[in-house]
């Protein structure tokens, strides 16, 4: 999947996808030894626990990818939300929606299926020119996006699929079907899952009550995920939408929602 999607970066359609560098197959033993030298890391602890329970194969496939120096989106927000202005929120949300819109234009049935905040990486750079704006063309529409020194990149496509092009056995299991992780077109699914998990317990659950989060940001998120789709019969326990009605699409939000009005050229 990552190799296929990298075409959008290489052709200049979006910079917001992690690029693969290479992959190889090897025995898992060297990684177990490496993990044991980082005993204070929770991620490595979890890795070792699963290894001890024989949850991994002896031979594994290793992917080397582009590095993102800002960690994942969830950690970035938790560390920076107190100083983030409306502009920063708008640009970051634009980047997330724009890359989905670009992918869905060519592959309408594409689903990431696990677009939670910690599956989005962040690249941070110094802002040398505060007046600089980047020109995006998304499905024939122009947008001018301020340079905030932050660039997001989609990552972790383990559950992603494009029916008929890239199949994924993980989305054909009974347990995934029950929570609507399936190879069925729904251009709202990834949008919903990102915003709904972002504001839930275990992620950034104080989002709705924090004074530091601008009200325009909260209002936008509520328009994307209204209450009826944030919990209840339409949503799984962990926040996944349980139907495949396309309530709204990324491109529609960019083209028509007032939140992105400043990025659209004046007519």
Residue ranges and their predicted role:
Residues 1-17:
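Structural motif at the C-terminus of the N-lobe alphaC helix and the adjacent alphaC-beta4 loop
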Residues 3-8, 48-51, 55, 73-76, ...:
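E2/UBC-UEV (E2-variant) core
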Residues 5-6, 80-112, 117, 126-127:
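Conserved kinase catalytic-core helix
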Residues 14-19, 59-63, 94, 106-118, ...:
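Core residues of folded domains in eukaryotic genome-function proteins
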Residues 15-87:
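Conserved structural core of kinase catalytic domains
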Residues 25-27, 68-72, 127, 159-160, ...:
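Conserved beta-strand elements of beta-rich interaction domains across eukaryotes
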Residues 109-187:
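Catalytic activation segment of kinase domains across protein kinase-like and atypical kinase folds
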Residues 178-267:
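Helical subdomain adjoining the active site within ATP-dependent kinase catalytic cores
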